Amino acid sequence: MDTCHIAKSCVLILLVVLLCAERAQGLECYNCIGVPPETSCNTTTCPFSDGFCVALEIEVIVDSHRSKVKSNLCLPICPTTLDNTEITGNAVNVKTYCCKEDLCNAAVPTGGSSWTMAGVLLFSLVSVLLQTFL
């Protein structure tokens, strides 16, 4: 597989996160989707006061190639996590960090963070399979 497949996998994961996400109000969060990890993100006010700011760091490994992107956004819940997952033979690691304070999702903290959202990966697998057949 080449970097095109890596990019498609990352985009699909991020698209699913966006489709599954409702925004929260009142909380101020950083907001960017599928950008390189060193990229600065804009801020946004979330629609519901009980929302979470979420930071995702997504790494897709195809053969010996690694690709990382980050997403920062508002979600109504903190996503459930697992350890590591494989989608169509590719290793996908998603570090997730959730918080409930203004602008607390600047980055996924190093060490001790959780990995891989189960729902996102399930929907991503379906999306990848659908895209394969289209």
Curated annotation (Swiss-Prot):
UniProt keywords, alphabetically: Cell membrane, Disulfide bond, Glycoprotein, GPI-anchor, Lipoprotein, Membrane, Signal
Positions of the pro-segment in this chain: 106-134
Cysteines joined through disulfide linkages: 29-53, 32-41, 46-74, 78-98, 99-104
Statement: the UniProt record of this protein carries the keyword Disulfide bond: yes
Lipidation, GPI-anchor amidated asparagine type: 105
Short name of any one Pfam family annotated for the protein: UPAR_LY6
Domain of life: Eukaryota
Cell compartment(s), UniProt: Cell membrane
The keyword Lipoprotein appears for this protein: yes
Endpoints of the signal sequence: 1-26
Summary of the tissues where the protein is detected: Expressed in bone marrow.
Protein name: Lymphocyte antigen 6G
CC annotations in GO: external side of plasma membrane
Domain UPAR/Ly6: 27-118
Membrane topology: Lipid-anchor; GPI-anchor
Alphabetized InterPro entries for the sequence: CD59_antigen_CS (IPR018363), LY6_UPA_recep-like (IPR016054), LY6H/LY6L_nAChR_modulators (IPR051445), Snake_toxin-like_sf (IPR045860)
